[in-house]
Amino acid sequence: MIDKIKLIDSALEAQLKAICPYSNYPVGAALLSDDNNIIIGFNIESKAYPTTLCAERVAIFSALSQGYTNFIAMSVVTTDGATPCGSCRQIIAEYAGDIPIIISDSKKNFKETTTFKLFPHPFI
């Protein structure tokens, strides 16, 4: 069973680490592996804005670099509860598959969806 609040709390902690001096829009993500480890990510902005990395991709790439390959859920926290961008949806679909995604605002108001509900026709 997925502990949604623990996953949201982990994403909230990650959100506090966001490096977003240009947008001032911190995002945190928490990815749950099949062996119950939580890998976090946060957005990291660059002056060359296209090179900016989103929290969701940082979490997935960090997990992959640590040897994790199977994931069972993800939580994403933004100030207002926004959903992942298209690039992140593609990466989630490609590397995590159709997993539950918990979308939350900073006050823990959340909704649940899945990868393929957000992105029904990924390029995979």
Region locations from a protein language model:
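Short solvent-exposed loop/turn micro-motifs enriched in small/polar/acidic residues
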Residues: 22-24, 85
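Feature of Fe-S/electron-transfer and energy-metabolism proteins
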Residues: 1-2, 6, 115-117
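Short beta-strand scaffold segments in enzyme catalytic cores
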Residues: 26-33
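Short, basic/aromatic recognition patches
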Residues: 7-20
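Zn2+-dependent cytidine deaminase-like catalytic core
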Residues: 40-124
